[in-house]
Structure formats: C-alpha cells, structure tokens
Regions:
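Feature captures hydrophobic
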Residues: 1-132
Length: 132
C-alpha cells in the first residue's frame, strides 16, 4: 500500500517537472482543465487537478473527477502503473478487471498522451539509421 501511495504522489511531481522542462509538454497541458483520480477498490487513492499549466494532487478522493482509474488493490495498481510496457500493462489490467475505468474516456486518452511525455526518449541504434 505504501509503494502505491508513494507512486501516486511521485506521479504529480514527475508530471510537473516535465511540464516545467519540456516546452512540448507545457503546450500539451496549456489551457487544459481536468480533475481525475486514481484509487483502489478499498478507497485509498489520490486526485489530481490539471489547470493553468500546473498539476497538483491531494490525498483522498473527490466527487468531481472527470474520470477515475480504480484498481482492484494497491499491489495491482503499483504493478500496472510502474510496468515498463505501460500501455500493454494498462490494457491487460482492463481486460482482467484489475483496472476499471469510469468517466470520460476522451479525457483518459488525453491523460495517456500526457503520460507519454514521462517515457524516456527512444534511442535509435546507429545501424538502424537509414536515408529512407
């Protein structure tokens, strides 16, 4: 449970750092107003507000979330959110019912686009570089 809660707290810090350091990420969130939450079925979680080019988070849950990611338990939540293969892990979680998404799915897709900024840049091997 502690690792899950820590990961949720760190998520907001990482997103804000990326917004501050990456102009493309800053443009992506510019003008966006979104409230969402990530939680467990037992009720532990955190909610996030994206507004005015900033991300802030608070412990607990909110009634005004535009979407909610609900994990069956903290262990599964940590496993899915910290997976190296993020998108396939997310889809496996939805398929196995370890993750339930409720709310506005367009906002979920927007959020997935935001989390793409957290991925390390793809390194192209010198042998893979071709003119075509």
């Amino acid at each position: 449970m502690i690792k899950f809660k820590f990961l949720l707290w760190v998520l907001a810090q990482l997103l804000q750092r990326k917004i501050n350091s990456n102009p493309d990420c800053a443009r992506y969130v510019d003008g966006k107003r979104l409230t969402f939450q990530i939680r467990t079925a037992a009720g532990a979680g955190r909610y996030y507000v994206v507004e005015n080019g900033k991300v802030r988070s608070s412990s607990g849950l909110t009634d005004s979330a535009q979407f909610t990611l609900s994990f069956v338990n903290a262990h599964k939540g940590f496993e899915i959110l910290s997976a190296k293969d993020a998108q396939p892990a997310f889809l496996r979680g939805v398929g196995s019912k370890d993750l339930v998404i409720s709310g506005n799915f367009l906002e979920v897709l927007w959020f997935q686009g935001l989390t793409e900024f957290l991925q390390p840049p793809k390194v192209i091997d010198s042998l893979d570089r071709t003119a075509f």
